[in-house]
């Protein structure tokens, strides 16, 4: 009885479906039409509003209907601006920012953030430092006040400095267990040897032990200036409100320098070279290979990002095998050449690192390197329209999905104003991506990959890592 009832229901449903398919009224119904197109969606993204205070501080925001907001300060300060003597000072200062200010000593700062139900975070890179708070939109005034206090009134008490010194030394030991972090520090050290970009963000342990209160004070007074900062916010807020709060809490921030004290970026030359740290007791080898890439604002970056999307990424835990769309991933999975690989395009103000990092068994290093370089050469000589279209769609997806939430949007605003001088709209990114075709990919890849000297870093059981001259010979093909 139940089965026959189901059959009758299914039959009735089919007749209704057939009738509705033939109904012109239903086809004309606005409720069933497609939603906004991709291009229309890009045009509807809220505008980023930018203002500037008299002292040079830039204030930027993107308003949305969300009940939360993220607000932060992005600063042109990082290990690239440090010398060998004070390398690690910026990272040290960032740590001290969480340990109280002159107005909120001890754990008073943490308690105030927690009482709001907010999250305070910070990070440092080779060129930038950021402090940001994610909170309810109604708590924006308090969040801006806290950020201003952190940036302008960092407590540099001797007792707190000594406590944090031990914490950072412990962190350095923990960082040495992250093979990926180690190999990328090695890659920077060999690629930019003898220049500030070779320095790690955390600095060497010798510097951590020696940095004094005077060193940290000098670093703050030199780099934490209004023209080097961006106050960025995203979420449920109004730009006028943010600008008024910035005027109230940041107008006293210094915006002038002595003539000889303006921080400048010295040129960082790229050196094709190799650094190897053999450790046979480790289970897997980590290898990174990169050529010199362009800086943030270079127009070639879009085509290179498409090329990286074509090469793709792979992790053996994801599955997929031979059916993966990336030729390199398919070969790696079918022949079990590696545990994982990923491409990267690390940009700095005037240079960058463009390459790939892979993790594999010690007996597969040679084969994985050979296949990877072969894919680069193939893009230089015979990239096809179909795979370029796939790479463009992957890049579009990554570009849009990355900006999901107030924190990623806020970070994008702050970083963009420091690197580009403006926030590039998604519609403009789309037009740049649309201009890329197979010819452009071949030309740009030939410019950066073909017959170029790479930098190579290896860590772990790397006995089978090819000699540098052999790796260099893999950067061109003797084919006609």
Swiss-Prot record:
Has keyword Iron?
no
Q: Where is the transit peptide?
A: 1-34
Topology of this chain in the membrane: Peripheral membrane protein
> From which domain of life does this come?
Eukaryota
Query: Which Pfam families does the protein's record reference?
Result: Peptidase_M16, Peptidase_M16_C
Q: Does the keyword Hydrolase apply?
A: no
Where in or outside the cell it occurs: the entry states: Mitochondrion inner membrane
Could you tell me which SUPFAM superfamilies the record lists for this protein? LuxS/MPP-like metallohydrolase
PTM sites of type N6-acetyllysine? 111, 138, 163, 248
Where in the sequence is Phosphoserine found?
Answer: 212
- State the UniProt keywords alphabetically: Acetylation, Electron transport, Membrane, Mitochondrion, Mitochondrion inner membrane, Phosphoprotein, Respiratory chain, Transit peptide, Transport
Post-translational modification N6-succinyllysine, affected residues:
163
Cellular component terms (Gene Ontology): mitochondrial inner membrane; mitochondrion
A GO molecular function annotation here is:
metal ion binding
Question: Whom does it interact with, and what assembly results?
Answer: Component of the ubiquinol-cytochrome c oxidoreductase (cytochrome b-c1 complex, complex III, CIII), a multisubunit enzyme composed of 11 subunits. The complex is composed of 3 respiratory subunits cytochrome b, cytochrome c1 and Rieske protein UQCRFS1, 2 core protein subunits UQCRC1/QCR1 and UQCRC2/QCR2, and 6 low-molecular weight protein subunits UQCRH/QCR6, UQCRB/QCR7, UQCRQ/QCR8, UQCR10/QCR9, UQCR11/QCR10 and subunit 9, the cleavage product of Rieske protein UQCRFS1.
Tell me which family the UniProt entry assigns to this protein: Belongs to the peptidase M16 family. UQCRC1/QCR1 subfamily.
**PANTHER family in the cross-refs:** CYTOCHROME B-C1 COMPLEX SUBUNIT 1, MITOCHONDRIAL (PTHR11851:SF116), METALLOPROTEASE (PTHR11851)
Free-text function comment from the UniProt entry: Component of the ubiquinol-cytochrome c oxidoreductase, a multisubunit transmembrane complex that is part of the mitochondrial electron transport chain which drives oxidative phosphorylation.
Protein name (Swiss-Prot/TrEMBL): Cytochrome b-c1 complex subunit 1, mitochondrial
Which gene is the coding source of this polypeptide chain?
UQCRC1
């Amino acid at each position: 009885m139940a089965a026959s009832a189901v059959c009758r229901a299914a039959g009735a449903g089919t007749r209704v479906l057939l009738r509705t398919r033939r109904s012109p009224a239903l086809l004309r119904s606005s409720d069933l039409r497609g939603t906004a197109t991709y291009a229309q969606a890009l045009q509807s993204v809220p505008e980023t509003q930018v203002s500037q205070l008299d002292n040079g501080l830039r204030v930027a925001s993107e308003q949305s209907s969300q009940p939360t907001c993220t607000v932060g300060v992005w600063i042109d300060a990082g290990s690239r601006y440090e010398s060998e003597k004070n390398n690690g000072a910026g990272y040290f200062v960032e740590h001290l920012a969480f340990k109280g200010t002159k107005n909120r000593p001890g754990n008073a700062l943490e308690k105030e953030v927690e009482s709001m139900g907010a999250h305070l975070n910070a990070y440092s890179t080779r060129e930038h430092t950021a402090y940001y708070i994610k909170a309810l939109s109604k708590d924006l005034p308090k969040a801006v006040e806290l950020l201003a206090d952190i940036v302008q009134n960092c407590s540099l008490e001797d007792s707190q400095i000594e406590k944090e010194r031990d914490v950072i030394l412990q962190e350095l030991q923990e960082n040495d267990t992250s093979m990926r972090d180690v190999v990328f520090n090695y890659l920077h050290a060999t690629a930019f040897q003898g220049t500030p970009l070779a320095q790690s963000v955390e600095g060497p342990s010798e510097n951590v032990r020696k940095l004094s209160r005077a060193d940290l004070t000098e670093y703050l007074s030199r780099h934490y200036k209004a023209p080097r900062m961006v106050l960025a916010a995203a979420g449920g807020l109004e730009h006028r409100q943010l600008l008024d709060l910035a005027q109230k809490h940041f107008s006293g921030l210094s915006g002038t320098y002595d003539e000889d004290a303006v921080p400048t970026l010295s040129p960082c030359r790229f050196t094709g070279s190799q650094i190897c740290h053999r450790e046979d007791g480790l289970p897997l080898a980590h290898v990174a290979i990169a050529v010199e890439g362009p800086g943030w604002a270079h127009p070639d970056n879009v085509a290179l990002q498409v090329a990286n999307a074509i090469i793709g990424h792979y992790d053996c835990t994801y599955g997929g095998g031979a059916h993966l769309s990336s030729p390199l991933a398919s070969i790696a999975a079918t022949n079990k050449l590696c545990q994982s690989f990923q491409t990267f395009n690390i940009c700095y103000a005037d240079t960058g690192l463009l390459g790939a990092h892979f993790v594999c068994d010690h007996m597969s290093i040679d084969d994985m390197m050979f296949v990877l370089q072969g894919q680069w050469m193939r893009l230089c000589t015979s990239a096809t329209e179909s795979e370029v279209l796939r790479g463009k769609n992957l890049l579009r997806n990554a570009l849009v999905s990355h900006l999901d939430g107030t924190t990623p949007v806020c970070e994008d605003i702050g970083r963009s104003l420091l690197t580009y001088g403006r926030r590039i709209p998604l519609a403009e990114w789309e037009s740049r991506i649309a201009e890329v075709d197979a010819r452009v990919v071949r030309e740009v890849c030939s410019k950066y990959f073909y017959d170029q000297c790479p930098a190579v870093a290896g860590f772990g059981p790397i006995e089978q890592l090819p000699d540098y001259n052999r790796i260099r010979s893999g950067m061109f093909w003797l084919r006609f």
